[in-house]
Regions:
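Conserved donor-binding/catalytic core segment of Leloir-type glycosyltransferases
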Residues: 194, 221, 229-247, 253-257
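Acidic donor-binding loop of glycosyltransferase active sites
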Residues: 237, 298-312, 325
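N-terminal strand-loop element at the rim of the active site
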Residues: 7-13, 26-79, 88
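Donor nucleotide-sugar binding/catalytic pocket of nucleotide-sugar-dependent glycosyltransferases
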Residues: 132, 145-226
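Nucleotide-activated donor-binding/catalytic signature segment of Leloir-type glycosyltransferases, i.e.
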Residues: 273-295
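Conserved acidic donor-binding segment of nucleotide-sugar-dependent glycosyltransferases
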Residues: 341-342, 346-353, 361-367
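Short hydrophobic beta-strand element within catalytic cores of glycosyltransferases
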Residues: 317, 326-329
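A charged, aromatic-enriched C-terminal amphipathic alpha-helix characteristic of glycosyltransferases
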Residues: 76, 367, 371-404
Length: 423
């Protein structure tokens, strides 16, 4: 099978790129012929593989482009990338080739989606965010710090400044979304999507194409199995991620300070000083490598995951479970699906400081932390999340379903044409 993987970056700059690269390499290891289509270098070392051809348009992503006008146009419609994709797909056998779309909004643009659709090769798209529907890809009102329930591109949406920057940026995103829908034909002509959580499918169900098939694929977490940690032996709670408002870091800082709980923030971001003001005793590590972040996890009482928006999963929660650390997660986040409330961790009401404080207070009980952590560990290592081979087998099964559905559609179309010709 030939697999065309489409992603803005060819290196790991976030969870989506990590998944795209892991899957591409895993499929290549299984003997599939993989083309990795991207816009931005550098190329990850893992992609240097005998069964992988990297096709790069050699461009900037939108934020790093020194030419703002060029970035403005490229973000709406990347003509160069569309041409490269169109040329690549011209001579491929559509009966044994599949296009797997990941992220295209930061460099490649919806032009590559339209070029893919024009090839008539079967397509599947992983929903790493909500960009198929929402102009900001988040369903989140940043100034109000709350989940947005407005219909995307409705008059109410257009008049609402929900952007993380300013209203002018929101209007640019609206333009991009309109072009994606009307010229890029996304999502209306995409018939297969992959989700990593039920919540992602539920949020998107009203915006996908009629008849679109939603395939659930448990994400794989790269983690080496070691004995479970001992959360009962430590008092410090830990947060891993970017220090930005929508991730709920100030909520976490205020709650921990009120309960006199030590809290370590592993990450960097613009809210570092506000966090220090909210919790003067909090430790902020700045950026650290993966091995160091794992050490912070293993010496924590619990992971706090206070995100204010939906999220499409919450990979760090799975990583905490892999080491036997319980997690505190909001009830509006997809992370609630991987934390069994009162069994492998605790849920709290999203944005509710009093409820978060109460749940943190519960986890001051070392015995409870130990029981929840061990249950999280056992649950993780008995699930598909811990097996790359299971993940790849499930992905191949999805590909086979997509190809079979396309063949059935072709057969129906041919039959209809034959009936018409007889008439």
């Amino acid at each position: 099978m030939k697999v065309i993987v489409v992603n803005d970056n060819a290196h790991v700059n976030g969870g989506a790129a990590k998944v795209a690269i892991q899957e591409a390499v895993g499929l290549a290891d299984r003997g599939h012929s993989v083309y990795f289509v991207c816009a931005v270098r550098p190329i990850a070392q893992a992609l240097i593989h005998s069964n992988i051809n990297v096709v790069c348009s050699e461009q900037y992503d939108l934020l790093s482009n020194p030419n703002q006008f060029d970035a403005f146009i490229q973000g709406w419609w990347n003509t160069k990338a569309a041409h490269i994709v169109g040329q690549l797909l011209t001579d491929l056998d559509r009966t044994n080739t599949i296009i797997h779309l990941h992220v295209w909004t930061r460099a490649l643009s919806a032009s590559v989606v339209r070029a893919s659709l024009a090839s008539d090769i079967p397509i599947v798209c992983t929903l790493h965010d909500f960009s198929l529907a929402c102009p900001t890809a988040t369903f989140f009102n940043h100034p109000r710090q709350q989940i947005c329930h407005l219909d995307p591109l409705s008059p109410a949406c257009l008049l609402t400044n929900c952007d993380t920057r300013n209203y002018a940026q929101k209007l640019w995103r609206v333009g991009r979304q309109f072009i994606q829908q009307q010229i890029g034909h996304a999502p209306r002509d995409i018939q297969h999507v992959i989700v990593h959580s039920k919540l992602a499918g539920e949020v998107m169900q009203h915006y996908l194409a009629p008849g679109c098939m939603v395939h659930n694929l448990p994400v794989y977490i790269e983690s080496t199995r070691s004995p479970p940690a001992h959360p009962e032996a430590h008092e410090t709670f830990v947060y891993l991620g970017r220090l930005v408002r929508e991730k709920g870091v100030l909520l976490a800082a205020r709650s921990a300070a009120a309960e006199n709980i030590p809290l370590t923030f592993v990450g960097s971001g613009p809210l570092a000083e506000e966090i220090r003001a909210a919790h003067p005793q909090a430790c902020i590590t700045g950026w650290v490598d993966h091995a160091t972040s794992v050490n912070y996890l293993r010496t924590a009482r619990a992971l706090i995951f206070p995100s204010m928006w939906y999220e499409t999963l919450g990979l760090v929660v799975l990583e905490a479970a892999a080491h036997g650390i319980p997690s505190l997660v909001p009830d509006t986040s997809a992370a609630r699906e991987i934390v069994l409330d009162g069994v492998t961790g605790l849920h709290f009401r999203s944005g509710d400081e009093a409820d978060l404080r109460a749940k943190m207070q519960q986890l001051k009980d070392g015995n409870l932390a130990r029981v929840l952590g061990r249950a999280a560990y056992d649950h993780f290592w008995s699930s598909n999340y811990s097996s790359l081979e299971d993940h790849l087998s499930s992905l191949e099964n999805i590909y086979r379903k997509v190809l079979a559905a396309e063949r059935t559609e072709d057969t129906i179309l041919v039959s209809q044409l034959e009936v018409q010709s007889v008439r």
